[in-house]
Amino acid sequence: MGTQSIATYRRRFAGVMWRDLQPMRVREGVVECLHPLPWLAASWAFAAWQIWPLAAGASFMLFLTALRLNHEAIHGNLGFRGKAHRWVLHGLSAMMLGSNTAVAFQHLRHHRYLGTPEDIEGACGRMTFWQVLREGPRFPLQMHADAWHRGGPVVRRRMAIDLALNALMVGVALLTMAPFLLYHVGVMLIAQCLTGLFAVWI
């Protein structure tokens, strides 16, 4: 996407009345935080019962609702005060098995550096469908590595919390060998490889 295309894009959408990121009351923010939980419970239940198609469908919805909630938390839009938005990101990191602190860092840079080489998150938006799929496993690793490198001590400290929560989730799954937890770890790792497709490209 060249400079001309970026300018055209911004001009074309400058007058659009976007309906996302509407300011929320605290009660609405709490409800928003609850949206992924029924899908988490359903995916674990179906995995425990070995009904894999339904488990996969519930996991798909879990990841999509978690991505939506993550976006609201990144922009501080849930109506909470203090550090609450950050703790939402930490909780989602434990559930989604990635660092949402890193995602937040890259997403805010995406808004600032749209369409430039600094826009790592937006790079997938300039690829073909097959390129995005091929890039999938590398995309979250690149997002995390760059955030760790550029983010400074505060971002690295918050990323360390996220990654410790990831390790805890994986550790519990391996120690208990609970089928639904092992399934969750596997399906979330696959979902992380598809974030470039669902969160950026589509």
Summary of predicted features, one role per range:
Residues 1-60, 93-197:
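Non-catalytic, topology-defining segments of multipass membrane proteins
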Residues 65-82, 103-118, 202:
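Acidic (Asp/Glu-rich) catalytic motifs at the cytosolic membrane interface
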Residues 79-95, 125-126:
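Post-HEXXH active-site segment of zinc metalloproteases
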